[in-house]
Amino acid sequence: MPCDGSVATTAYQDRYFNLPTYYYGVPIRYNEDAVQNYAVEELRGLIRFIEEQTGETFDWDAFFKAMKVYNRETEYELQKWEVNRTPYPQMTGETFWIYRMFFYHLSGGMDPHFLDTDRRVNRIMMRGYQQKKPCAPAMRHRCVEWSCPANFYPDFSVWAENCWGINVVASMESLISDIIINTEDPDRALADLARSYQRTTMRKHTKGGYANVLDELWVVCKQYNADMVLMYDQISCKGMDGLRGVFE
């Protein structure tokens, strides 16, 4: 349960639609080794729940096949991160985090369109990087967007870039789980998947202690050579709302 919105959605489905529900508990203190066994057992419980509801048996071969595709997609994503750390970033604005956020939740290594898109986009990206082409007419500032973004206003970064020369080279919700999933051993695969879910959207930086969002911001600024931070005032996330004073 990463946030109030998730809790409310699950409660609504459970109460009003009378749907079978499994409450998948993801550890908050995800950097601690002591919680990892619990995290894996939660995943095993989720698998058992699905098997009971569907009458099907979990197909490890299909899972490993999908995770191989997912791992390749993750490698393409990491290429984007690396290029944006250079003097010639190629992926700025909302394109960076919106695609990352939704492909992470939608693909699961099952939809071939995502991997094909990654290949094509990264080919264009690497061509621009190798030719040292600027991604915008003017780059006055290298900026990091922090806190939870506003999905209902996705063109904010484009406006900042076009009007002010503020190039967003990294966004908090694009820098989510980069864990490569084991594709041979079921136990190791579940351990990797559990660690990945602990670092997903609205979790990696907003859970597990202030260091994951406050201290991590300065790490990201250094990695991306940023000279500006744009901070979303996300009042619907209690984690970020509670840390606002710490940032100030």
Residue spans of the language-model regions?
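A charged, amphipathic alpha-helical module
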Residues: 40, 44, 48-168, 172-182, ...
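Trp/Phe/Arg-rich N-terminal binding region typifying the photolyase-homology
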Residues: 1-58, 174-175, 179-248
